[in-house]
Amino acid sequence: MSGGLDVLQMKEEDVLKFLAAGTHLGGTNLDFQMEQYVYKRKSDGIYIINLKKTWEKLLLAARAIVAIENPADVCVISSRNTGQRACLKFASGTGATTFAGRFTPGTFTNQIQAAFREPRLLIVTDPRADHQPLTEASYVNIPTIALCNTDSPLRYVDIAIPCNNKGPHSVGLMWWMLAREVLRMRGTISREHPWEVMPDLYFYRDPEEIEKEEQAAAEKAVGKEEFQGEWSAPVADIAQLEVPDWSEGVQVPSVPIQQFPAGIEAATAAAAVVAAKPGPTTEGYSEDWSAQPATEDWSAAPTAQAGDWGGSTAEWS
């Protein structure tokens, strides 16, 4: 459907994406209606899908989707886990309606139930797994688009896109390619610039694998914290260490400091000086204390003899 236009031709980076995701790898069985899309068969029995015809059918499907005026009238369905995330991303990017998970029988035919829908276009991931919506679409004349492998039945399928619909990377890449072409044909994004959305967002991830990756990352982080190589004590930066002064703000009472001799030598020298000084002489002095008169006036001034016991005041000073 490229019509020979260079702008619609498959680019080299698109081919590399197809090869990296394994989109060209079919199954070991071949349906007679899918034989026209097979390039050749490998020695191990796996059929190789012609990527040129895959690209042509991809453009045809994108044109059919763009022809629907209301994007919500396009219904995308995937009952397999590998395509549910891709369907949700496709629906959020293009505005389509999605049924991720189990398809309720009678959604297209039973008008009584609350989940009744009347889409104008149906897109499925696997014709064999999504046979129920394909059968109901045939009852109400809804055109259908399907991602078909080499062994997929083409009954009730109007536009078959040959690709590997088993691998999670291949399914995610095909939905990403389809969403990109739809947005390009609508004029939402430009063909001259690459789309900022990566195909990895459309890939299915097993919850067990995600949990294992998180556990491995946590164990790696714990092991890195425990092993620090040769241990060495950290060098304290004394120059920048600030010691707080706890005496700040504490009122200390002012008590006079008593001066004492410096040591034993000072005390000994003071005693020797006192011993060397002459004391009061008692030679020729024989006072009889009993001969004192009984009527001594104690209020009178003291005699000069009373001050000779300790020497003069100048001698002690």
Swiss-Prot record:
It is found in: Cell membrane; Cytoplasm; Nucleus. Residues 161-180, 205-229, 242-317 are annotated as: Laminin-binding. GO terms for cellular component: cytosolic small ribosomal subunit; nucleus; plasma membrane. One of its GO terms (molecular function) is laminin receptor activity. Keywords: Acetylation, Cell membrane, Cytoplasm, Membrane, Nucleus, Receptor, Repeat, Ribonucleoprotein, Ribosomal protein. [DE]-W-[ST] repeats lie at residues 230-232, 245-247, 288-290, 297-299, 315-317. Pfam families: 40S_SA_C, Ribosomal_S2. SUPFAM superfamilies: Ribosomal protein S2. The record marks A115, F116, P133, L134 as: Cleavage. Transmembrane segments: none annotated. GO terms for biological process: ribosomal small subunit assembly; translation. Acylated. Acylation may be a prerequisite for conversion of the monomeric 37 kDa laminin receptor precursor (37LRP) to the mature dimeric 67 kDa laminin receptor (67LR), and may provide a mechanism for membrane association. The modification N-acetylserine is found at S2. Residues 278-317 are annotated as: Disordered. Monomer (37LRP) and homodimer (67LR). Component of the small ribosomal subunit. Mature ribosomes consist of a small (40S) and a large (60S) subunit. The 40S subunit contains about 33 different proteins and 1 molecule of RNA (18S). The 60S subunit contains about 49 different proteins and 3 molecules of RNA (28S, 5.8S and 5S). Interacts with rps21. Interacts with several laminins including at least lamb1. Interacts with mdk. Required for the assembly and/or stability of the 40S ribosomal subunit. Required for the processing of the 20S rRNA-precursor to mature 18S rRNA in a late step of the maturation of 40S ribosomal subunits. Also functions as a cell surface receptor for laminin. Plays a role in cell adhesion to the basement membrane and in the consequent activation of signaling transduction pathways. May play a role in cell fate determination and tissue morphogenesis. This protein appears to have acquired a second function as a laminin receptor specifically in the vertebrate lineage. PANTHER family: 40S RIBOSOMAL PROTEIN SA. Belongs to the universal ribosomal protein uS2 family. This is Small ribosomal subunit protein uS2. It comes from Ictalurus punctatus (Channel catfish). The lineage of its organism: Eukaryota, Metazoa, Chordata, Craniata, Vertebrata. The gene is rpsa.
